[in-house]
Amino acid sequence: MMQRLRRRAILLLALVLIGGAYTVYADQRTRTPEAALMQILHAVRTEDRQLFDTYVDEDAVLTSLHTDVSTLLVDNIDALHARHPADWFFRHDSAFMKNYMEQHRTEHLDAARTALDFYFDTQRVPVTKTDGNARWGSDEMRAFAAHYTADMEPAVIAGDRASVLCRVYGDDTDYGRLLSEGFVTAELVRRENGRWKLVRIRTDPARANGFYAFIDAAERYWELQGWD
């Protein structure tokens, strides 16, 4: 049970990166990467599923996010154990972690998709235990969203692809203090209609307040929830 809670919390923090931070950007043009991200944030804030789907390739984001997180956990398992020696999840070797993440890939992705479904449909009633877990996840997404904001650097555009460095930071509350500052990069592609669509969110262990900042936040989240 505990390992499932921890896995869900990792996914929860990842989902927060999709749209849990709100801010207002100066660029109001509709056909720029920055404007696309602003529309995503607005969709999350207003729980507008149609607008969200217009600017987010959900399958691409979630599958790439799982792949990226899996790779980061495998490649940095020794450093993670040294950083958080009390966490059983980091006491395994890279071979175990690789196999573990591969075995649970479908479960993780299904959980993330269902949590998003509940987020955008507050009238949906949980029926199964899986539904209940997803509903809990969507409620936690709202809790995070209420206490985080973001800003971003100008987009770097190469042909029909763009990357945008975003800084996410919390307020002075229990949830907000979990992550004082974290950096992620949003990747978008330009569709045939000229609009940009989010396809990937990644973070870098080499960047200050990158990957490790989110892991540290997850560890603080365990404590906040009383899971330790």
Where in this protein do the model-derived segments appear?
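Short, Lys/Arg-rich N-terminal segment immediately upstream of the first membrane anchor
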Residues: M1-L5
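Short, low-complexity N-terminal intrinsically disordered segments enriched in polar/charged residues
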Residues: L11-N99, Q103
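Alpha-helical structural elements
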Residues: L17-G20, A95, T114, D131, ...
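Low-complexity, intrinsically disordered terminal/linker segments enriched in charged
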Residues: A134-D228
